[in-house]
Curated annotation (Swiss-Prot):
Protein name listed in UniProt: Protein FAM210A
Gene Ontology, cellular component aspect: cytoplasm; membrane; mitochondrion
Subcellular location: Membrane; Mitochondrion; Cytoplasm
Primary localization class, coarse: membrane
Phylogenetic placement of the source organism: Eukaryota, Metazoa, Chordata, Craniata, Vertebrata
TM stretches of this protein: 136-156
Gene3D superfamilies found in the cross-reference section: 6.10.140.1430
Record membrane topology: Single-pass membrane protein
Domain DUF1279: 117-229
Gene: FAM210A
Function in brief: May play a role in the structure and strength of both muscle and bone.
Length: 272
């Protein structure tokens, strides 16, 4: 007596469907015709042959019905199924990571004008203003510094005694003693006051630079600087245009050389 494997599998499937109370979970029953490809979560496949209607009970498995195919058709291998699932998982991870990266990188904020930015210290404002408006700040700073030093020197000439003031501020005794016993007197006193008034001098310089910049812009001597974002976009467009022109020139040259080569080859063939 020969053992018919397909018939035995069909009987087991029919018995499982007819006795649902023995199963812990109800699955899906499908009425299928033709060959049936049954595979579970572990990618094990069983091919059931049969032309009659069969009810199958599926709890933790997936059922795929296919039409009859030639005898040389084979079911997909478990390795292929696992490879496809791995590809889908990797692609999902890539998309998720790219979205997280795009959300985690906020756009860079445009830097405010250092003349109007009050959130930074006086020294930082002075440095940024020097970088952006150096041509305006240097003359203004030289003029204001000359006025400051001249004022202090004039006060020293008039006999203004600044030593008590320096002691009140809390300067070291070594500096105060130098000013007391100095022979040059007026110049050194003016220089000491000049250095002490550095915060006030920087503030006056920034104010004078701001007024000068507004005046120059209102009369058309200085253009208003565009925002950083627009400036970068303009630069990128200019660079793109230059690259496109160079590529077109190179393409034209190559086309001409190819045409010349073809003409030479055709001429040689005609001569031969």
């Amino acid at each position: 007596m020969q053992w018919n494997v397909p018939r035995t599998v069909s009987r087991l499937a029919r018995r499982t469907c007819l006795e649902p109370h023995n199963a812990g979970l109800f699955g899906r029953c499908q009425n299928v015709k033709g060959p049936l490809l049954l595979y579970n979560a572990e990618s094990k496949a069983v091919l059931v042959q049969g032309s009659q209607k069969q009810w199958l009970h599926l709890s933790a498995a997936q059922c795929v019905a296919k039409e009859r195919r030639p005898l040389d058709a084979h079911p997909p291998q478990p390795g292929v199924l696992r490879h496809k699932q791995g590809k889908q998982h990797v692609s999902f991870r890539r998309v998720f990571s790219s979205n997280a990266t795009a959300q985690g990188t906020p756009e860079k904020k445009e830097e405010p004008d250092p003349l109007q930015d009050k959130s930074i210290s006086l020294y930082q404002r002075f440095k940024k203003t020097f970088r952006q408006y150096g041509k305006v700040l240097i003359p203004v700073h030289l003029i204001t510094s000359g006025v400051w030093f001249g004022t202090f020197y004039y006060a020293a000439l008039k006999g203004v005694n600044v030593v008590p003031f320096l002691e009140l501020i809390g300067l070291p005794d070594s500096v105060v003693s130098i000013l007391k016993n100095s022979q040059s007197g007026n110049a050194l006193t003016a220089y000491a006051l000049f250095k002490i008034a550095t915060p006030a001098r920087y503030t006056v310089t920034l104010g004078g630079t701001s007024v000068t910049v507004k005046y120059l812009r209102s009369h058309g001597y200085m253009s208003t600087p565009p925002p950083v974002k627009e400036y970068l976009q303009d630069r990128m467009e200019e660079t793109k245009e230059l690259i496109t022109e160079k590529m077109e020139e190179t393409k034209d040259r190559l086309t001409e050389k190819l045409q010349e080569t073809k003409e030479k080859v055709s001429f040689k063939k005609k001569v031969e």
